[in-house]
């Protein structure tokens, strides 16, 4: 089973670390568990290597070297069999199953197919599918070519489908946008036509409490993930043959900038803040009549807003306050749920107890305020 294979890989990883730390008994225990879960010649060779050359805890040079040699051979064989053309792309090993899984995601036509769920899937179904795939495709665990892009596609798929409004829009227009994006960018872009507001790496950290370092993923200030090779490719494609060509290509961007600037001038900033903001003059504290929400205004607020206009402002204040509570409550619940899942996945009782305590008081408080 796929779950047994993932657990076996985790046991192998722990065993290799134990060998490096001169803990042969611990290494042997986890290797035997891995062999029971998902028997492979590689694990059998590691077990034989430890059994043939037992050493005291403080003197383990020969088993360690033999085991590392066996591991390197197994990793090299997996890499060569997985993809001969991509062998030089990464110095880390990967399996044929990982390459096939990346290929499956790459060939998916919509977000539902990426997550492996039906169009009528519930929120719980989406969470289960995302947890399984995110751990499987995270760039620090899966080193197959294209795994990083597949991880991004999985995160974007969940972020869109878990948002009721975005999911409704995607069900109506997502396929058309996905086709336009694929025609414009090729298969390597993994459905860039319909973006989410949260980056896949941030989403992973919310679910699993930052279980992996983001060494291969670049997240910029707008919260969406981009990759350097896409930028270099776009720059090469957008280079014009002359000044007129450059001007024609830049014309849509200039128009967009002009429209954005005009819209900023036409839209005034809110006359209130939910927190103290001296930089914009919101220093005077007020409380709404209905929900007693605290907000801050400028010196001239009392003269400019009275009667119905004041009621409208306070209604907007309360709407913003409730939206913030819902967002914070959802994030804290997701983070706690992710920590609990990781604790159960790794069988760590201390982590489970910590997850039961961390974040719970604030999450309950925010939800109760609603």
From Swiss-Prot:
By its UniProt entry, which InterPro entries does this protein fall under? DnaJ_domain, DnaJ_domain_CS, DnaJ_subfamily_B/C, DUF1977_DnaJ-like, J_dom_sf
PROSITE patterns associated with the record: DNAJ_1, DNAJ_2
Membrane topology term: Single-pass membrane protein
Recite the UniProt keywords alphabetically.
Acetylation, Chaperone, Endoplasmic reticulum, Membrane, Methylation, Nucleus, Transmembrane, Transmembrane helix
Record carries keyword Membrane = yes
Q: Which positions carry N-acetylmethionine? A: 1
Query: In UniProt terms, what function does this protein have?
Result: Acts as a co-chaperone with HSPA8/Hsc70; required to promote protein folding and trafficking, prevent aggregation of client proteins, and promote unfolded proteins to endoplasmic reticulum-associated degradation (ERAD) pathway. Acts by determining HSPA8/Hsc70's ATPase and polypeptide-binding activities. Can also act independently of HSPA8/Hsc70: together with DNAJB14, acts as a chaperone that promotes maturation of potassium channels KCND2 and KCNH2 by stabilizing nascent channel subunits and assembling them into tetramers.
Protein family = Belongs to the DnaJ family. DNAJB12/DNAJB14 subfamily.
- What is the designated name of this protein? DnaJ homolog subfamily B member 12
- Gene name per UniProt: DNAJB12
